[in-house]
Amino acid sequence: FFCLSCTNDNGNTDQYMPTPSPLQIPQLFEDTIIPPVIPLDNPQTVEGVTLGKKLFFDPILSANNTQACASCHSPRNAFTDPARFSVGVDGSVGTRNSMPLFNMAWNYDERFFWDGRVFSLEHQALEPVTNPIEMNTTWDAVVTKLQNHEDYPQLFLEAFGDVPITKELTTKALAQFERTLITSNSKFDRH
């Protein structure tokens, strides 16, 4: 009789077990709108949302560590930018205003950017990092910074299991957080 065990020295299994984090959908939406769009390969998890939120507010995604997603998608302005043209890294001025990021879970046609050129929230998050005006860096540089950071390796491990940090996992975490940005009680919503 031969038996193998999949536990480590302290008796815990090394199995990846993320904590599901269903969206907190307002009753108004439950009553009047079809369910949100959540990709099967990127389910909402507590760990993924936590990682995505940290990434969203951290300027580590930009070339000179000065520009975060929240720099243009400001929580003080309902995750929008009140400026006519958004300002990127090194003070470079873009040609458009950044899009608002609330209620993204209900973007049924899955088209992003003002011209609709990208077809998922996960893929949308890829472009600002490499845009020369917005964050002006490469994904290889970002992944290296994340791998060498004191917090991110553990956060990625908790969110996605024992796999290497990649640009795809980074954008999945960002998308999970962005799907939690739900508005339903503003003056506009109540009208």
Locate each region found by the language model.
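Periplasmic c-type cytochrome electron-transfer domains
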Residues: C6-H191
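Sec-dependent bacterial lipoprotein signal peptides
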Residues: F1-L4
